[in-house]
Amino acid sequence: MRRREFLAGLAATTLPMPAIASRSAAGTLKVIHGANLSSLDPIWTTVPATKDYAFMVYDQLLSIDASYVIRPQMAEGWTVENNGRAYTFTLREGLKFHDGEPVRSQDCIASIRRWAARDGFGQVLASRIDGMDVVDDRRFRIRLKKAFPLLPAALGKSSSSQCFIMPERVAATSPMTQISEHIGSGPFRFLRDEWVPGASAAWARFDGYVPRQEPVSGIAGGRVAKMARVEWTIIGDVATASAAMMRGEYDYWDQVLFDLAPMLRQNRNLVVRSPIVGGTYGMLRFNQLHPPFNNPELRRAIATAVDQADYMRAVAGDDPANWAVCNSFFACGTPYASEAGNGILREKNIDKAKAMVKAAGYKGERVVQIAATDSAPVDAMSHVTHDLLQRLGFNVDYVATDFGTLAQRRVSREPVEKGGWSVFHTIWNNPDILDPAVNQMIRSNGATGWFGWPADDTLETLRGEWFDATEDAERKRLAAEIQAQAYKTLPYIPLGNYTQPHAWSKKVVGVVSAPTPIYWNIAKEA
């Protein structure tokens, strides 16, 4: 459907229609969430809905503030000894899980171990750890094979997969298996009995939570749950969601369609802006285990034809204030962004790309593209790629589904004939791709890597050198080399940056600018 036709249809939906939900009750934040909460394990998956859920339910030892400084969170503090080879962490007093049990050092060690098996930064940390020891219930020590000054950054990061602390018995679950208990120590308790996958989810304030006695800053500081309840309603249809916000039936919406933002801004009862720091990046991910995209020349052919502006206009409209081209594997406008090796994305040459497809020996193998229709940005990018692949001569099987199903299917390492996949789109926020440590998508460590499983020993060696570097100038040089190598093998294709608007009632106060949506610090005025 064209934008003009869609907006004409939307005008009808803003007329009186049956109410979707009752007006927000006092003490309850009613949220329209654009994507299904399909998994409750933030280590097993990195989908945004699970990440948003996890920041309410779980807590971190350390966290990152608005100035990108790592600060204590669950930790009271830490000491560094033995020439940087031993870190001793002390937990704050009074920490407890939602089942009433105290948070202990054993829980922290088990949680670090499980997280480090899946996360890219965590895997590097794990390779440097010589051992982890319980000192007592509130203190534990991490012993390193050699100094690793980035250890606090790994434990406190907000990006990709976070090191959330779980009870020891839960963290003992294989990192390749989803957990069956969902008990954290964060400011909100998840109400499992009220969870209806695909429809709704709810949380209640955890009265046993002891926040830090300091102002919130980014995701650091005092995580004060000011609302008694948070309720998500999953509304994938943007016209329905917009009409509900216009009528004041919900308090917050996290995925406003760009075309609808001007109309919502005309409503004197709404605020429309993005609280997400640095915006969001679109990406095209390949399955590199199976044909046809185990052939790097075919990946390069697609990159040669890509025009980021086509993708960003599809997502964010024609106003360049909403989006930007970013031909970097690291977030543009940050220290590690560069132009190294990115000439292939400046080609934008469909005829050259067609010739490359032919020269690469493509034989008409079926390409299964999975597309999440309940995420407006992912849906928009998916249509652009579908058209591009067809123009390049690929035999495309376009599978439209929801993000939760996509997240389940992308786990499969089977060929397409057995339910596997070939390509999909995903989105990551600015802090998720700041540098080689946190950019999960650039990892090229094969079977132990993120979905798509690219393998590139050269890139991995360069990444290891980046971690070992001690000077900023050396790290910048190595980051540029990593990017140049990534453009040769293409673990993914960067598709640009956009600023996703959110909308909330003017009665809602305390919305924090952060790397990810957060629900603590938010209150509602009468």
Task: Give the label of every model feature segment.
Residues 197-199, 237-238, 256, 346, ...:
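Ligand/substrate-recognition segments at binding pockets and active sites
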Residues 504-526:
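Long beta-strand-rich cores associated with HINT superfamily self-processing modules
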Residues 90, 124-171, 175-196:
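Surface-exposed binding/hinge segments that line
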Residues 300, 344-346, 397-408, 436-506, ...:
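Extracytoplasmic/peripheral linker and loop segments enriched in polar/acidic and small residues
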Residues 32-82, 113, 183, 494:
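N-terminal lobe/hinge region of extracytoplasmic solute-binding protein
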Residues 289, 293-334, 380-381, 486-494:
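Periplasmic-binding protein-like
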Residues 188, 321-359, 373-380:
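Structural transition elements
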Residues 211-263, 395:
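Ligand-site clamp/hinge motif
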